[in-house]
Amino acid sequence: MSTETVAKLLSLQDIRYKAQKVLQKAESQSLKSFLYDPSKLPEVADFVVSVIQADFKGKYSTIPPHGRWQHFEVGNVPRLSQLVSKWEKEGVDSLEICKRVLDVTFVSVLLDAGAGDVWKYTDGKEAYGRSEGLAVASLRCFESGLFSSNPDFVYQVDGKALQALTSEKLGAGFQVTEQNPLAGVEGRATILRSLGKQLGSGRPSDFVGRIFPTGDFSKGLNVLELWSELQTLLIPIWPVRTSFEGQNLGDAWYLSTIDAIQPFHKLTQWLTYSLLIPFKSLLKVPVVNEELLTGLPEYRNGGLFVDLGVLTLRPEFSYATEYEPSSVTIVEWRAMTVVLLDKLLAFVNERLKPELSEPLSLAQMLEAGSWKSGRIIAKKLRPSTAGSPILIKSDGTLF
């Protein structure tokens, strides 16, 4: 591990680089927890293609990139779009509208760790669980001013309000009761309070002014610049799990399989994907280096490869065990998820080639294909919970 540096471990590029090393181990059946069967990948691709075709056949170019915006509008209710229209009618300028969307997206993604199998958020006549429920709940809390310290300016998130956010206030906003328990409420509130300390009196969206100090967006948004801003802001707020040379590394874990630290930075990547959408849709800012983002190593994408037999736990490991995020089992699974999503994208584009005007991006496949497919197969195999095939201990700050 002597060649490691903190900067490298916090970089986007190191995620794929290390995951490729894990794949090399898998190809010689040298993973410690899993057996790897690449012959099952075409079957996974067929399933994912069928899911994509069911929703988007003949209109593949309309597949949105993976991001939080779609979760806000679950049930075909244009909650965020209606807010944007309202602000436009009120004469709010496009930059401030974008900043408001960035603010709520920021908080919503940080709250988007696994909700558990029971919790639901009721919005109107509908109840939503899991990721979409968390999205709608966070949007409604944003609209109510929970994340703003200024009662005359509720449509913002600011550090002062976040520092004062208790788990009780957050739980109330998310309709948490004994009968409607949400996993990791205190962990979620702690993350937001930590973010508040980092922000001081500022807003999450203030990074826009640092990346574009003159307000000229014509140069485009470099994902690497955005990534640097986000890592600087967020690394100090994560619980210390793995550190290197005294520096917290966030979502990065030592993996004995490759005798190295395997970074993932999953929530920060999910945030990056999600923040790109308002830049593109509201400000029409071109984006470069987006391809450096990886597939997200979480249980929907990863579960797809377990449920369809690409990865199988070795006999000495049990599907009934709840594994720590730091365990070899979970870190191997997540690393393999990163590289298998890249492989899956190639298969999917090959199968859809006759129907596509241009190949699907990884972000589009994550949105319309792998994530949804993982959820569908989980519901089929585990109808009572639709949960993960491999159980992970969650504290509300990671998955």
Curated annotation (Swiss-Prot):
Entry-linked InterPro entries: DUF1688
Gene Ontology molecular functions: catalytic activity
One cellular-component annotation, GO: cytosol
Classification via Pfam families: DUF1688 (PF07958)
Source organism, top-level taxon: Eukaryota
UniProt family annotation: Belongs to the URC4/urg3 family.
Record-given protein name: Protein urg3
Organism, as annotated: Schizosaccharomyces pombe (strain 972 / ATCC 24843) (Fission yeast)
